[in-house]
Structures are given as C-alpha cells and as structure tokens.
Amino acid sequence: MAEESVPSGSLLSLDPELQKDFQQKVHEIRRKSQVGAVSPGVIYIGHIPRALYEPQLREYFSQFGTVTRLRLSRSKKTGNSKGYAYVEFECDEVAKIVADTMNNYLFCERLLKCEFVPPEKVHPRLFIGCTAKFRKPTKPAVSRYNKRRSEAEQKKMTQRMLSKENKVRKRLAEKGIDYDFPGFAARRERKEPTCDADTSVSSQDPTPVCTPTVLERRKSVRLEQNDEDDDDGEVVLKLPQEDEEVVLKLPLKVTPTAKRQKISKSEKKTKIKKQK
C-alpha cells in the first residue's frame, strides 16, 4: 500500500489509521471558528510524569490547538508537582478531541488520564495566577516559623492548636483508648495533701515554746543530742520544769573549720611551752 501524502503544516494523529478522520474534524473546527465565535474548552490531565512542568506541557499540547491557559497543581510547601493539571483550549471541540486522543496514552512509563471538563463544572477561580512565573519557595517552614505574628494571629493559632488537641482526645475516647499525653494547654500543678497534715503538734519534735500549757504537757520530755566532741558548736536543749526558764547555752566562740587560720609548727611549739 502506498503511503498517503500528508500536506505540510497539518496536524498528525497519534493513530495513523485515523489520520483522515482526524484531519476532517480539525478542518471542520477551523471552518466553524472562521464563521463564528467559539467557546473555550478545559481538559483534566492526570498521572503527569515528574519531568513535565508548565513550559513542557504548553509546548506539547500546543500541537493540537491554541492553548489559552494552563494550570499545573503544585505543593505549597515544596513547590513540586502534584501530578495533575488543567489545560484550556481556545475551542471546546479541540479540547474534546485531545481528551479522547490522549486518554490512556503511555507517556514516560505512565498512562495519562485525560477528561473533558464541562463548562458548568469549571471553577471560576481555577486559572487565577496561571500567567505568573512560578518561583519555588526557599525554606518555607523556617520563614513561616520565624514570622512575627500579631496578637490576633497568635490567639487564632492557639485556638486552632487546642481544637485539634481536643479532637484527638475525643477520637481516642470514642475508640476506648485510655491514653493521656501532655497537651498545649498550661496546667497548674495540684499540691497533694500530706498524710501528716492532721497530726497534732505534740507528735512532732519538741520546740522551745514558752507557754504554760505546752510546758505542762512536756514535763517528762527531754531532748539530748549525744555528740562525739563537746566543742562542736551544737546546741543542747533541755526542757525545764514548771517554774524554770528556758536557757540556750552556746559555745563562746564558734568558728567554722573552713575559716580557721593555719598555724605553723613554730607557733605550735611556743604555745605548748607557754602552757607548761
């Protein structure tokens, strides 16, 4: 079979067997566009390879017709492609042909998914900002963390964090999971009452209280602290009888060991001779 001659400048179908039908449809679309105004058409493209971005997609789909607008979905945090995009053609008939032709087309080891989106389902804000040049965010998490927030923004942020925490706690309670974790809300520490709070003063160690009632109760109580040395500087307390006064006997000179001056050997010998 002789190969059919294809005029230069005409579009080529992906399937050579359907080249005639494809050219007829394109010819009809171009004739209609010359006669009257045409309505634009939008297609959805899924399973896009990672290597394709806005310039590559626009260049590839421009072979079917005039591409007026293109929107590739990207991540706000990283700026990478999410794998799907929306392309608007000047004519809706061209968009339908592209959706039928490129659906389930193997491209870079991926099957492209193309669907025609009806005009009533196209969101009015779908292509906002599509003409601006994309700039990949640099350290978005750091800039977001170091951002100076106003009082209203801080209040809104704390309310959002507390609401998320309450939702997590409710979800755990609904599933019957008894699990507690420290949250964002500040909690006051509760002071637990001691077990000796209800005990009387008489059960505690004796103190030198000079009231007649206490002295009468503690006539037979005596506190003595046995020390290895008598000159250690410790207080020896003895509770008196009825008519005696409380006297605290302290040593005349109490000097801490750390502050004592060092005595030389010669001074020690002179002191010993004087004592003799």
Curated annotation (Swiss-Prot):
Tell where it localizes: Nucleus, Nucleolus
Q: Which PROSITE patterns match?
A: RRM (PS50102)
Report the residue ranges that make up the RRM domain in this protein: 41-119
This protein's record includes keyword Cell membrane: no
Mention one GO molecular function.
RNA binding
Name of the coding gene = nifk
Taxonomically, which superkingdom? Eukaryota
SUPFAM superfamilies given for it? Answer: RNA-binding domain, RBD
Q: Does the keyword Nucleus apply?
A: yes
Q: Which Pfam families match?
A: hNIFK_binding (PF12196), RRM_1 (PF00076)
- Keyword vocabulary terms for this entry: Nucleus, RNA-binding
Bias (Polar residues):
197-206
Report residue spans for region: Disordered: 190-211, 256-276
Organism lineage reads as: Eukaryota, Metazoa, Chordata, Craniata, Vertebrata
Name this polypeptide is given: MKI67 FHA domain-interacting nucleolar phosphoprotein-like
* Gene Ontology CC terms: nucleolus
